[in-house]
Structure formats: structure tokens, C-alpha cells
């Protein structure tokens, strides 16, 4: 959960803070009172501006670098900016149409890769997308292939045309004809349902006494219960890591090396994304809000993506704290919506 930081400010202070942070994001240089007098659109003297800036610094919203008379935003300043001051610049209708074209068609993995690439290319930062758990996807077809006397391969085909193979060791030996009858039964009764939903039904039915079931049903449910053991392993798609090397804001090579190690392991990034999966809308972590020392100079903007009303995963952008939040926030939101629509399986016949 990202903490809000919103001290009470009058309208002049809010306007000066908004203008200063916007100028700093654009130019990367400390902003002085003369620049603010020209850019803020307020009819006040430079002396009054300096007094207001001193008050904002006292509140912990700004900081004065030793080598400059200007000021830069702190993490608290950025937090207040994104919470209440930023003026969003959403993608144009043409951009949104292009996004839909680029995200049309293809299997799940291809769509996740496209989304990550788009986020990285349009922001020049790092794009990340967490992959959905397969248990959330819609079942279309299954085949069983005997590997040997003790092992069977279950070939699962989902509504998005992705294929997953699972090797199981059944509790009894099945003849090829039996496997065909079992697969026919499962295909007839469970098409169009998620694996999680199928598992719930199967486990419920298995609680009934076996002598109350037809033999085919018992065998089908027995195989299905073994095939549908939950697989909690998830992955994320990360694109554009090397873009961070060109950023002046991230010039600490030791910190950058630690960040690349996090990208390589993916575990910490995945845990961070999971913190936002049940939160509606865009979530923003600024610096130490990530809970990781190596990301104290980093911001993460995330949004969940969903299909047919069910949240499947989270995507986002990782970049420096000095990022164009006015463009990145609505872009992340739009890409999440477009990805969710692209992942919606077609209506089953």
C-alpha cells in the first residue's frame, strides 16, 4: 500500500509545487525562483516565491542541492504530486487504436511480451507484466497420451490456443481406449470453464461414495484430480532493462548493478507486483515505498489487467523517480485495459 502524503497547502503553494516538479521532470535541473516566476502564471514577486519555496522545503516536499540555488522534489514531493497535483496526458485516440492493433491476436505469452515491449518503448523505461496463473484460464480441450505403464501426459488446450503439457502418474494403469473415453467425458462436461472451477467441481464430486458413480465418471474425476494440482509458479516478462543505463538519474553503478540482479531473479519484482493485484486502478511506488534499498531511486507505476471481470495479473513501468507521471500513469492504465480485452477468450460454442 502506498502511503499518501498531502499536507494542507494554499492554492499558490500548490501551483508553485506543481510547476516546480513539472519543470524538474522535464529538464532534470534544480528549479529556481526566477524560472517559477516565468512559468507558474502567478502575479507574485520572486521574494514571495522564495518564501513559499522555503515553506515547502520545511514541509519535506523540496530539497536544495548544495551546488545550486534551485530546488528539487523529494520523494514526499513526488508523492503529493502524483496524489493530487499531476495533470494527466492520456494517449491520443490514434495511439490507442495502434495499441489495439499491436495487441490483437496471438497467444497469451505473445500478448504479455507485446504489452511489456509497448510499455518500455513508449516510456523509454522498463516494462513489466506478471503472467496469469494457468488455473484462471478457460479450458477448451484435453488429450491423454500414455508415456509408459506408469506415466500419462495430459495435453491441455486453452481458449486462447495456448497449450500446456502435464505429466501425471495415475493410481492405476489405463488402457488407451479408457484414456480416450475419459478425455471425451472431460471435453464434453468441462469445456468453457476455468481450471480452478473444474478443480472445485472435481473435488466435490470425489467426496461422494465411489459406488454411487459410474465407472467412467469415477475414472475421469480421478485423473482430473491428479492433473489439476495447483501450480503456483508464476513468471513475469521484463523488457527494456538496458534503457536504465542511459539515464543520468541512475548513475550509481553499484545501485544499478543491484537493480539488474533484481530484474534477473524476478522474485522481488513479482512480489512487488503481487502487492497491487487486488487493488483497483493504478498504484504507484516511489523510492523507499518499494521496500527495497536498491530501488530507492526508482518509481514503479502499476495497474491490474483483467478478462471477463477476473483479475489475471499486473503490469507496469519501472523508471527513475523523475519520470513523466502525467503520461506514464494513463499509459499504464490504457495498456492494462487493452491487454485484458485481448486476453478475453471467445465465447465457447
Curated annotation (Swiss-Prot):
Enumerate the InterPro entries for this protein. GAF-like_dom_sf, HrcA, HrcA_C, WH-like_DNA-bd_sf, WH_DNA-bd_sf, WHTH_HrcA_DNA-bd, WHTH_transcript_rep_HrcA_IDD
Q: Which UniProt keywords apply?
A: Repressor, Stress response, Transcription, Transcription regulation
- Would you say which domain of life the source belongs to? Bacteria
Instruction: Write out the GO biological process terms.
Output: negative regulation of DNA-templated transcription
Query: Under the GO molecular function aspect, what terms does this record hold?
Result: DNA binding
Transport among keywords: no
Q: Does the keyword Transcription apply?
A: yes
| The family this protein is said to belong to | Belongs to the HrcA family.
The function of this protein is: Negative regulator of class I heat shock genes (grpE-dnaK-dnaJ and groELS operons). Prevents heat-shock induction of these operons.
**Name assigned to this protein:** Heat-inducible transcription repressor HrcA
